[in-house]
Amino acid sequence: MTAARASTIKASRRHRLFYRMPHYADPYIHWSLIILAFYGLLMITSASMGLAIGQPGYLAFVIAKQAVFLIAGYFSMTYLANRFSLNFLKSQDFPKLAVGMVFALLACLAFPEVNGAKAWIRVPVSSLDISIQPSEFTKTLVPLVIAAYCGDVSRHYEKGRDLWGRPFLFVMLFAFIIFILQSDFGSMAVVLSIAIVCFLIPQNPAMRKFQRVLGVLTLVGVAGIIYLLTPAGIQLVEMLPIADYQKNRFISAFNPFADQYDTGYQLINGLISFASGGWRGLGFGNS
């Protein structure tokens, strides 16, 4: 058997076994993901037991629904991991993927808002209403976009802007759509946090000035958030031209007891759970 034939057979087997991660995958990250996924399923089951009282079949439906999403997500991850190639990041097709994500984010604007945010695409399947949040995929795409441009150390750049300019524009466009058009402040904050970390990692000399500026702006931003959680900061938040539900998130974070039956309800119940359950909790199904 020729080496080329053996290589083809090996590649074919690897593609068929899409439920396995490639050999170069980090096993610690892989198993951590599996453990956290099943732990999350157990926590959802535990939290749903109280709602299942008087509703036959409700708990089984919740478990089955979450299990389907978990399995589908895992197989999708392994499928893409086995077919991922660094050459794809350097190809002409990768920017098309980033542009496609922009259109996916814009498509959310055609659907009804949920809790003040237009961040979901709703797909009715039989009696189910499946929702897809493109901003969650953006959190995975942002590191790839930055790696595609800032990870190119084989070329010499006279200007740092030639290195980080395009990924920075993509990140800003994602953030603008998510925050301004979708009104999803939480997702925007996560996307920007991921982008900042990814921009600070490369050691290319052409990026040092940009990284210093970004580091200073990050410290200023953190200080600003801390200030907004002070009495003077809350007064400033109340004057900002943002939606009331966004203001209430800052207010409830500062003092959840200000509206304990609405915006502060979840925070207060979290405090109660810590106080009543301690470090070990109250047991499975008692939350």
Which residue stretches match the model-derived regions?
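Hydrophobic, glycine- and aromatic-enriched re-entrant/interface helices and adjoining loop segments
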Residues: 114, 120, 210-287
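Residues on a specific face of well-ordered alpha-helices
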Residues: 144, 148, 191-195, 244, ...
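Membrane-helix interface and discontinuous TM-entry motifs in multi-pass inner-membrane proteins
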Residues: 174-188, 273-286
